[in-house]
A protein has these predicted regions:
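Short, solvent-exposed beta-strand-to-loop segments that form ligand-recognition rims
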Residues: 188-207
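Ligand-recognition surfaces built from glycine- and aromatic
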Residues: 38, 203-229
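Short tryptophan-centered beta-strand motifs in secreted/extracellular beta-sheet-rich domains
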Residues: 43, 109-111, 172-187
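Short, aromatic/His-centered strand-loop micro-motif at the edge of beta-sheets
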Residues: 154-175
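Bacterial N-terminal signal peptides that target proteins for export
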Residues: 2-19
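Secretory/extracellular carbohydrate-interaction modules
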Residues: 48, 84-149
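Extracellular carbohydrate-recognition regions
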Residues: 33-61
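Extracellular glycan-recognition surfaces and repeat-rich motifs
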Residues: 50-82, 90-92
Length: 229
């Protein structure tokens, strides 16, 4: 297995060229399917046992490096999934898989995720406006806590802005969506809008990322990204 671990963060240097990224996926290396104005990352083109193409990897907080790898999954839409497989139990450890072809301020992201294992946490989420491993907005769901929460992370400090108690079953696929439009952030879980929150702490453009926590082994598929005006 040659899934890449956390490394340098070249995406930080390129955030200043966000205006060029308005074309976002036009030059993406990994093919993407267009669905109703959104770009769906083509999981079927990825190689099992390798790190997912077009992602860089980082970590907020402490603990060991993350491990992101493409795995077979018969229950995934394309029979493949992106998995964070490291089981480091450090509580303040938040692995990120940052999608490089996209830089945007206003964006709508939808994913499916499946909590597979974890004794400290079984969490999966979406980060937007990522300008560094320590600065972004986040929605995450946790199967051990049965809740979905929205956070802002500024200079590595995580602050909860909204929460909802809902059933998040382990071993099952769930849909999760985050719409960031100016200072308004709307969270959708399994087709239901849970909360809508206003915040202005991070007003500029940034990357989109997949997120996990601590020892969560979590799988992701059906990742779609739509740039908003």
């Amino acid at each position: 297995m040659d899934g890449r671990q956390d490394g340098p963060f070249p995406f930080i240097r390129s955030i200043g060229t966000a205006c060029l990224a308005a074309c976002m996926l036009a030059g993406a290396k990994t093919p993407a399917h267009t669905q109703a104005g959104a770009k769906m990352i083509a999981m079927e083109t990825m190689k099992v046992g390798s790190a997912p193409a077009d992602f860089d990897f980082a970590r907020t907080g402490q603990g060991g490096a993350s491990q992101w790898v493409v795995v077979d999954d018969a229950t995934a839409a394309s029979k493949l999934a992106i998995e964070q497989s490291s089981t480091d139990r450090t509580d303040n450890r938040f692995p990120l898989a940052i999608y490089q072809p996209v830089t945007a301020k206003n964006v709508e992201v939808a994913i499916r995720f499946k909590p597979v294992a974890g004794k400290v946490d079984q969490a999966g989420g979406i980060a937007v406006r990522v300008t560094s491993p320590n600065d972004y907005y986040l929605v995450r769901a946790n199967a051990l806590e049965d809740n979905v929460r929205f956070y802002r992370i500024v200079k590595g400090r995580r602050e909860q802005l909204a929460t909802a108690n809902v059933k998040v079953a382990s071993g099952e696929w769930h849909s999760l969506g985050l719409k960031a439009e100016n200072d308004r952030f709307t969270v959708v879980f399994n087709g239901k809008t849970l909360h809508s929150t206003s915040d202005r702490a991070l007003p500029g453009p940034g990357r989109v990322a997949l997120w996990t926590k601590s020892d969560s082994v979590t799988r992701f598929d059906q990742i779609s990204i739509r740039i908003l005006p």
